[in-house]
A protein has these predicted regions:
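Active-site loop/oxyanion-hole signature of alpha/beta-hydrolase fold enzymes
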Residues: 1-41, 53
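Amphipathic alpha-helical segments in well-structured domains
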Residues: 15, 19-22, 77, 81, ...
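Conserved hydrolase catalytic core segment
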Residues: 32-79
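Alpha/beta-hydrolase
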Residues: 82-83, 90-163
Length: 166
C-alpha cells in the first residue's frame, strides 16, 4: 500500500487519469457497489466522477474538505490572504506576479497561510498514521494544482462542477 507514486510523469497528473484509475481499481477488486470518500483533491475527483461518469453501484459519497470549483477556492483564498499581515500579503503578491516562489519572505507567508488555513506541522503528539514517512513527490501537486494552495494553475485550474450539482 502506498507504493503507487510514479516520478517524472507529469502526463499522469490530470483528472481523466485519476478517474480511469478509480474505474480500473473498482473492476480489478470487483467493487460493484461502493461508498466513496473523497478527501481534499480526492473530493474533487469524486465530484467529477459522479457528475461526468455517472457510475453504477455508487451507494453514497462522503466529501471532506473539498471544493466544487477552482475559481471559488482561489477567490476564497484571496479573501483569507487579505486578512494576513501586510508584509505577508506583499510577499505572496510579489511571488504570484513574478512566478518566483523561492524568497524567504514568500516561504514564511505560505507557511503561515498553511498553518492558519490548512494544516500545521505534524508533531510527535499527532497520531502515528500522520507521523509515518510518506512516499510522495511535489510533481503531482504542482502539475495538478499549482505552486501553492491559493494559486490554481495546474491541470485542475478550470475544474468546476457547480452547475452540475443539484
Amino acid at each position: 500500500c502506498g507504493n503507487s507514486y510514479v516520478e517524472n510523469r507529469p502526463d499522469l497528473w490530470n483528472s481523466k487519469v485519476w478517474i480511469e484509475e478509480l474505474i480500473e481499481l473498482r473492476k480489478h477488486l470487483g467493487l460493484d457497489e461502493i461508498h466513496l470518500l473523497g478527501q481534499s483533491w480526492g473530493g474533487m475527483q469524486t465530484l467529477e466522477y459522479v457528475c461526468n461518469y455517472k457510475p453504477e453501484g455508487l451507494k453514497s459519497i462522503i466529501l471532506s474538505s473539498t471544493l466544487p470549483a477552482s475559481w471559488l477556492w482561489a477567490e476564497e483564498a484571496q479573501r483569507m490572504i487579505a486578512q494576513m499581515p501586510q508584509d505577508m500579503q506583499d510577499a505572496i503578491k510579489k511571488a504570484t506576479e513574478s512566478g518566483d516562489y523561492s524568497s524567504p519572505e514568500y516561504q514564511a507567508a505560505e507557511a503561515e497561510y498553511m498553518r492558519q488555513h490548512c494544516a500545521g506541522e505534524v508533531t510527535e503528539n499527532d497520531p502515528e498514521c500522520l507521523r509515518r514517512p510518506k512516499k510522495a513527490g511535489r510533481e503531482s501537486y504542482v502539475v495538478g494544482w499549482g505552486p501553492n494552495e491559493f494559486t490554481p494553475l495546474g491541470t485542475l485550474k478550470d475544474y468546476d462542477v457547480i452547475d452540475q450539482l443539484g
